[in-house]
A protein has these predicted regions:
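Mobile, glycine- and charge-enriched loop segments
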Residues: 1-28, 175-196
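Beta-strand-turn-beta hairpins that frame and shape the catalytic cleft
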Residues: 1-4, 11, 16, 123-137, ...
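Divalent metal-coordination and catalytic microenvironments
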Residues: 8, 33, 48, 53, ...
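Active-site environment of divalent metal-dependent phosphoester hydrolases
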Residues: 10-15, 56-59, 88-102, 124, ...
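Core catalytic region of metal-dependent phosphoesterases/phosphodiesterases
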Residues: 19-127, 212-220
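Conserved catalytic scaffold of divalent metal-dependent phosphoesterases
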Residues: 100-208, 243
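Conserved beta-sheet core of the metallophosphoesterase superfamily
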Residues: 191-272
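Accessory, non-catalytic peripheral segments of nucleic-acid enzymes
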Residues: 265-407
Length: 407
């Protein structure tokens, strides 16, 4: 049985240039969607899975929302339905997938009899040419719903309560599975022990997580996850995977190949237990991110000549950010606008930002460190602007609720 596994499409406007009146980053996402649809036409999977976060932003203007829904259906969902025996579309998180958008998709595609949209947990048996398969669907969950029952709980307690609930829900649903038929878990959650987009490891208490032991306890033959944008095999005995986003979304994705999985489930002969899963990763035509670094010598050379020291090959057609090290005097002389123009002329798709990584303060002022929190950083910034103590105190008071919410 052949399974195409994708997720985290994040269709919508992303930070980047506008070309011919269209957000060019959105067009990058559509190009990845079309590639997946083309590969599905070649592979003809028994089941195609979209494991949540089809859309990028839940709350957008009406015209943008209509464009997103239209492109999701015409460029992605309908082509997949034509190429696949079944298409599974899972609701992700509410800050990305809007419930009303999913209702609209459901209404417009009601003629697609092989499309299965899951906005609530459940188990469904699908019949394919390779045999029956069960889908255990576990859409994303808004932990804010628990605040009514546990008001005043801190973030870690809230995460642990939601984690206990969602793992119990998953175990409860698994009792509905027919163990004689292959089953696939489709979920949109963080899995404890998985690698985050920035390379760190998620632990229980940091987020609402599904435990690897819970996945193993369900007895499913394959687990297809969405939510984390870094493709990876998960740390459990069950074959379980994040497919990641098909397109790079930010600089956390730099240097990471993005795409989708093609899984094959091989069932044992009749009367013998067990299945085997074979997996292959297919890379999409993603838009690359690239960090262009400049040392003091590079900054001096550019300031003197107005020309880039070098234009590395990865810079071509990439979303570029600049990180530079120099003295305070060198920074004053650095023409950032001219640097951006030169990078674009050298082939960069878009220059996202030009920021110092380290500026040596010859006056001896202490440097900003990674240990400083937002409060300390704001105090330092206001001091640098030479804001009066009274005004600084007023601004700090206004910022306090926002900083607390962010923490």
């Amino acid at each position: 049985m052949k399974i195409l596994h994708t997720a985290d499409i994040h269709l919508g406007d992303l930070t980047g240039p506008v070309r011919d009146g269209k957000n060019a980053r959105r067009q990058d996402t559509i190009a990845c969607m079309k590639y997946i649809a083309q590969r599905a036409a070649t592979e003809t999977p028994n089941v195609t899975i979209i494991a949540g976060d089809l859309f990028n932003r839940s709350r957008v203007w009406a015209d943008t929302a209509l464009d997103d829904v239209n492109d999701a259906i015409t460029e992605f969902i309908r082509p997949l339905c034509r190429s696949s025996e079944h298409v599974v579309l899972l609701f992700g998180t509410e800050n990305h997938d809007n419930p009303r958008a999913f209702e609209t998709v459901r209404e417009i595609t009601k003629d697609e009899k092989n499309l299965h949209i899951y906005t609530a947990p459940g188990v469904e048996k699908l019949t394919t040419s390779a045999g029956p398969v069960q889908i255990l669907a576990l859409p994303g969950f808004d932990k804010g719903r628990l605040r009514l029952f546990c008001p005043g709980a801190d973030k870690e307690t809230e995460n642990r309560n939601a984690t206990a609930l969602i793992n119990d829900v998953l175990l409860g649903l698994s009792t509905e599975l027919d163990k004689s038929i292959p089953s696939i878990l489709v979920a949109h959650y963080t899995v404890a022990g998985s690698e985050a987009d920035n390379g760190s490891t998620f632990l229980a208490g940091q987020d609402v997580v599904i435990l690897p032991s819970t996945i193993d306890s369900t007895g499913v033959d394959l687990a297809c996850f969405g939510h984390i944008h870094r493709p990876q095999k998960l740390p459990c005995n069950t074959p379980a995977y994040y497919c990641g986003s098909p397109n790079q979304l930010n600089f956390n994705d730099e240097g990471v190949k993005h795409g989708f999985w093609l899984h094959r489930i091989y069932t044992s002969p009749v009367g013998e237990p067990g299945t085997a899963v074979e997996t292959k990763f297919d890379q999409t035509p993603e838009r690359q991110h690239y960090t262009y670094r400049m040392g003091p010598e590079d900054v001096t050379a550019f300031t003197a000549s107005g020309e880039l020291p070098e234009a590395p090959e990865p810079l071509k057609d990439a979303i570029v950010r600049v990180r530079y090290n120099c003295t305070a005097e060198q920074e004053k002389a650095l023409n950032k606008a001219d640097l951006q123009k030169k990078l674009l002329a050298a082939g960069a798709f878009y220059v996202a930002e030009v920021l110092p990584e380290d500026v040596e303060d010859v006056a001896g002022e202490s440097e900003v460190t990674e240990h400083e929190g937002p409060t300390e950083a704001l105090e330092r910034y206001l001091k640098k602007l030479e804001v009066t103590p009274e005004e600084a105190a007023r601004l700090m008071e206004l910022a306090a609720p926002l900083i607390k919410k962010a923490d």
